[in-house]
Regions:
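Acidic, mature catalytic/reactive cores of soluble proteins
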Residues: 1-595
């Protein structure tokens, strides 16, 4: 079974996916949204990769160096054993600055014996467009593509460079290194320098993980998902949905999208999760990104580029075969043109936490207040209109219940912020508007025929997003309507241990895969309505659906439990953390002994 058995490494500038046999099959340089250098993930023949060739007698196992994002792949045979430690340098270089170069180290550590290997270095820059040439110099191997001759990469190594290019077999007799850099290095690189980079990066990750709150159960699960979320954050505070593009929701279908952008919804949920377990710095950086990006215009979008870009035009790369033959391969995402009324609810919930717990300086508070007013003017003007919803349908807009609920959240949180700042007129106005939304949802969203809230005002379909009505405070768990909705959603959408997000037809047909995050939403919903044992059993089952490193993509196959969709996905990992916290915090409460 192909379970997306990749590890991820990165440094908040870019990231790489490395297979369970140590082959780099996805890497964009110099940034997350740059063209790929290796894209075998999307085309085995053309995409390019960077790996190690060993005989069939070698056993290979992979794990993370504990508490870090340094990936270890160990090759073992009778003749010898070696370990490849993959990482991207990431550490504080000055008092307030971090060193985040566009480069990747492969530290080859000799464990025992005299293992034999060959380096398979096959870059294919610019999404494998153009002819590739490798030029060997005394210092490095230079990669150049005919598609853009100014875009180059440099491979440094303690191994003979001609042996690398010619893929000759090498007998490992000591520790060696490979360094792939987007820039030509200004200082000489040797094994001692590499070890310094390794130690600095190791210390950085250990310190970062140490700031994550600790729990008596599921701590390892929480920690790994938090490390993934950190890798999905750009250094300016933007948060990516995933580091990949065009991994299909279902193999062979066309629901293939580029996720290397910052959605307000996804990012707000991710940052709130990071803040909840102790990472205040990530929240502050995101708030600065939001202020600088959204304050530039009142023409709000649901998503932006990682540097705040507004135009994210979608095109296809028709020369690539696609993951497992699933075409098209897309870059860019036309969803940026959509109206999704729910997005600002998630953002306003986070901004409310900002005001409560990390308000910053007076000028920052005032700048944020101006943004709050603009957002809520937008929400007030648009909540009555149809939209594309949380699932970004590409057909006609609808009056989605979850969108109305999140508009209520936006106005409710805005009213609370206004009350905190003693802006009583705004508080009263926004409370009244929020109450109007509540009445509207209760009148048009609840359907007696199905004894549940429905997906939209105009249908009787069920939708997993209805489960969010309780955690965002629209309706209490004790309300019979919420309990009935949870049970109705489970009956309609829970299938073979997993959840559909919805199962009515959309503009691409009927969804055929499970949405990973939605199963975690169901677990939480079952927990809050009192079905604790069922919730915990289902949670433990879901954890087994991760790959060999505990990483999750966006989707799962109902029958095989094979992962699909972009990977690793922020939605899935924030849901892992939030669900694990239900049980971890309960366990800690029960284990607390008063003196």
């Amino acid at each position: 079974m192909n379970n997306l058995n990749y590890g991820i490494i990165g440094n908040s500038r870019t990231a790489a996916l490395i297979s369970d046999r140590g082959r780099i099959e996805w890497l964009c340089f110099p940034d997350f949204d740059s063209p790929s250098v290796f894209a075998a993930l999307l085309d085995r023949a053309k995409g390019g990769s960077f790996g190690f060739e060993v005989s069939g007698s070698y056993a290979v196992r992979q794990s993370y160096v504990p508490h870090t994002n340094i990936l270890s792949t160990r090759f073992s045979a009778d003749e010898g054993e070696f370990e490849v430690l993959d990482y991207m340098p990431c550490y504080r270089s000055f008092e307030k600055e971090h060193y985040l170069p566009a480069e990747l180290y492969r530290y080859i550590r000799l464990v025992r014996g005299r293992p034999r290997l060959a380096i398979d270095y096959a870059p294919a820059p610019n999404y494998a467009r153009g002819e590739v040439s490798l030029r060997v110099t005394p210092e490095y191997v230079e990669t150049c593509s005919s598609y853009d001759r100014k875009d180059r990469q440099y491979l440094y190594s303690s191994l003979p460079l001609d042996a690398i290019v010619e893929r000759r077999e090498i007998t490992l007799e000591k520790d060696e290194f490979l360094l792939l850099s987007y820039n030509e290095k200004a200082i000489p690189i040797d094994i001692e320098r590499e070890k310094i980079e390794y130690c600095r990066t190791l210390v950085y990750w250990l310190n970062w993980t140490n700031r994550t709150k600790k729990y008596s159960c599921y701590n390892d699960v929480i920690e790994r998902s938090m490390l993934v979320l950190k890798l999905l954050s750009y250094y300016n505070g933007a948060m990516l949905a995933a580091v990949t593009t065009s991994l299909p929701e279902t193999i062979g279908e066309e629901r293939n999208w580029d996720y290397r952008f910052c959605w307000l919804r996804d990012a707000s949920m991710s940052i709130e999760t990071m803040f909840r377990v102790g990472h205040v710095g990530a929240a502050r950086r995101f708030m600065k990104f939001i202020q600088s990006t959204l304050s530039a215009s009142h023409d709000f979008q649901i998503m932006y580029g990682i540097r705040g870009e507004r135009t994210l035009t979608e095109t296809t790369l028709d020369h690539l075969a696609g993951y497992a033959g699933s075409r098209p391969v897309r870059i860019g995402n036309d969803a940026y043109r959509q109206r999704q009324n729910d997005s600002f609810g998630y953002l306003m919930d986070l901004i409310y936490q900002y005001y409560r717990l990390m308000p910053g300086t007076l000028d920052e508070i005032e700048d944020m207040w101006e943004l709050v007013k603009s957002i809520l003017d937008n929400v007030s003007e648009n909540w009555r209109n149809p939209d594309k919803g949380i699932w970004e349908i590409r057909g006609e807009g609808q009056h989605f219940v979850s969108s109305k609920v999140m508009c209520w959240v936006a106005l409710d949180r805005g009213a609370r912020i206004a009350a905190m700042l003693r802006k009583h007129a705004c508080a009263e106005s926004w409370r009244e508007e929020a109450e109007a939304i509540r009445r509207d949802v209760l009148e048009h969203g609840w359907k007696e025929e199905i004894q549940s809230f429905s997906q939209s005002y105009g249908n009787l379909a069920l939708d997993s997003s209805l489960l969010l009505m309780e955690p965002y405070g629209f309706i209490p768990a004790a309300d019979p309507r919420y309990r009935k909705t949870v049970l109705a959603v489970r009956k309609a959408l829970f299938h073979k241990g997993l959840m559909y997000r919805y199962n009515n037809e959309d503009d691409f047909g009927v969804p055929s895969s499970a949405f990973t995050m939605c199963t975690f939403w169901l677990i939480r919903a079952l927990y809050v309505i009192g079905q604790h044992n069922e919730a915990k059993t289902l949670f433990n089952q879901m954890l087994r659906n991760g790959n060999h490193l505990g990483l999750f993509s966006e989707h799962l196959d109902f029958d095989t439990k094979e992962q699909s969709g972009n990977f690793p996905q922020a939605y899935s990992h924030l849901a892992v953390v939030n669900t694990a916290l239900l049980f971890a915090e309960e366990d800690d409460r029960l284990g607390f002994i008063r003196p």
